[in-house]
């Protein structure tokens, strides 16, 4: 079974503004409320692909109630969130002319020791063969090393742990047996404490890193320049499928969901990576997270190349 942790989910308030001006009253062309959070996005795409999953973290207040009600629209998602007193956050996602996207993400509520204990207890149901996805930022009040401790605990029990968290902690998670990490270029540079001038240099360092951890793999997303799946055995590259980009929110989360879909089917690494690429494309080239029909359409167009350094 797939279990997804999204500690700090949100309501994302999407606004489209034609000509945004600072220190002026601006009018939107359109607006929409969408439940969000990296783990929520992974969960929804898996739902769209017919894969059952458990989604947990913290919800509270009228915003938390709204998120919980919206999750009822997805029959393959089991709402396993822990209720807290403080309200869940609202983020602002603003799209302007020229495809410019600006985000304002709220910090969210603060959890106490009781809430942390409740989540720790919930995770104890994980067993050998399960998949655990740790996705998104830590919630205020949570120990900074909480993710790492979870990896330490469950990777040693036969749980495949995925991590998508913008922190140097991704590097530490490799030492503890994390199954897959998914940085973008910024996150990889943060993890390595280094800036890269060329992709070749970056991929070389990524391969050298993964050579040290033969049981782990890295999906490195480079936006419109494609993505890589890197392990101690291979380097695979997937060029971007061309099309009109509608929005980029949830692209990386869709990659994880696509990979999980392939894993759930028992497919090999190359097929999983193809599905990751198709799922990300289906989200980026539409106005919502990937739907199964669009996923299948783009799956036929995915090209995977093996590279060597």
Regions found by a protein language model. Name each.
Residues 47, 155, 264:
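Gly/Ala-rich phosphate-binding loop of Rossmann-like dinucleotide-binding domains
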